[in-house]
UniProtKB/Swiss-Prot annotation:
Changing residue 197 to S: No endosomal localization; no effect on interaction with VPS35:VPS29 dimer. Changing residue 42 to A: Disrupts interaction with SNX27. This is Vacuolar protein sorting-associated protein 26B. The modification Phosphoserine is found at residues 302, 304, 319.
Length: 336
């Protein structure tokens, strides 16, 4: 980044010490594009140098101090301008003075806490970044560099299957089963649908993966539903006693781990939505929440002991509080 002042300009660059060996991860930007960023985990040290290059070697650059910050920040799009920082670390690199030649300043943030996963959604963005600042009397010179953080989880201690009978009284009665209630992002959802009673003409059946993003609190709560995937289970009329298998691979979809009440600002939850459509185009559905989590690769040698300990653990199974709507399949056989 260049700053043009009274005869002098400076280019600021942030360089990581392990840039050549550190893995990069794709991450969606605010405009929907995907870019690659350096990947970090909770507890890892962030170190490098801030390089200053003077454009005019015969002129000096006066400043009021130079610093580097590591920041974790949440931005709600409906409240732009108010950035909620949950991590804020500062290192002073130079006291007020002047720079007469290009030079570099080393920095290190040791075992940095990075409690949440990087996330860019419909109404919220959670980002981590380094920010170098040269303080000036008129305008500061600022350079930022974003990084991506992934939160790794251990295998859930409790991971029971989901099994439920649903239907419409005297019309439709089915039993569905999913092999687990918690899936890692590259997992396979295995299950089956069993038709106990069929007295309406079903022509189509599918499972949708729905991401529900909730932002804000109190009266300023916003819900955003996004259908991530549609998986056709059946095309045609089922008969009583028929069993239809389900095998849905998650690796091909853009999914994040489930995020609950992140810094009391937002949540991201996932649901499997079983949808049936009859010949009169009426839709019947049943939603079931599932937990998604990020499975670590083979433990990396470069991953610190603190980062391994900091891997998240799941609590017990969470049940879905449901809202009755027309067309929703009931689990107590009552007519909707």
């Amino acid at each position: 980044m260049s700053f043009f002042g009274f005869g002098q300009s400076v280019e600021v660059e942030i360089l990581l010490n392990d840039a050549e060996s550190r893995k990069r991860a794709e991450h969606k930007t605010e405009d929907g594009k995907k870019e690659k960023y350096f990947l970090f985990y909770d507890g890892e040290t962030v170190s490098g140098k801030v390089s200053l290059s003077l454009k005019n070697p015969n002129k000096r650059l006066e400043h009021q101090g130079i610093k580097i910050e590591f920041i974790g920040q949440i931005e709600l799009y409906y409240d732009r301008g108010n950035h909620h920082e949950f991590v804020s670390l500062v290192k002073d690199l130079a006291r007020p003075g002047e720079i007469t030649q290009s030079q570099a300043f080393d920095f290190e943030f040791t075992h940095v806490e990075k409690p949440y996963e990087s996330y860019t959604g419909q109404n919220v963005k959670l980002r981590y970044f380094l920010r170098a600042t040269i303080s000036r009397r008129l305008n500061d010179v600022v350079k930022e560099m974003d990084i991506v953080v992934h939160t790794l989880s251990t295998y859930p201690e409790l991971n029971s299957s989901i099994k439920m009978e649903v239907g419409i009284e005297d019309c439709l009665h089915i039993e569905f089963e999913y092999n687990k209630s918690k899936y890692h992002l590259k997992d396979v959802i295995v299950g089956k649908i069993y038709f106990l009673l069929v007295r309406i003409k079903i022509k189509h059946m599918e499972i949708d993966i729905i991401k529900r993003e909730t932002t804000g609190t109190g009266p300023n709560v916003y819900h955003e539903n996004d259908t991530i995937a549609k998986y056709e289970i059946m095309d045609g009329a089922p008969v009583r006693g028929e069993s239809i298998p389900i095998r849905l691979f998650l690796a091909g979809y853009e999914l994040t781990p489930t995020m609950r009440d992140i810094n009391k600002k937002f949540s991201v939850r996932y649901y499997l939505n079983l949808v049936l459509i009859d010949e009169e185009e009426r839709r019947y559905f049943k939603q079931q929440e599932v937990v998604l989590w990020r499975k670590g690769d083979i433990v990396r040698k470069s991953m610190s002991h603190q980062a391994a300990i900091a891997s998240q653990r799941f609590e017990g199974t969470t049940s879905l509080g449901e809202v009755r709507t027309p067309g929703q399949l009931s689990d107590n056989n009552s007519r909707q």
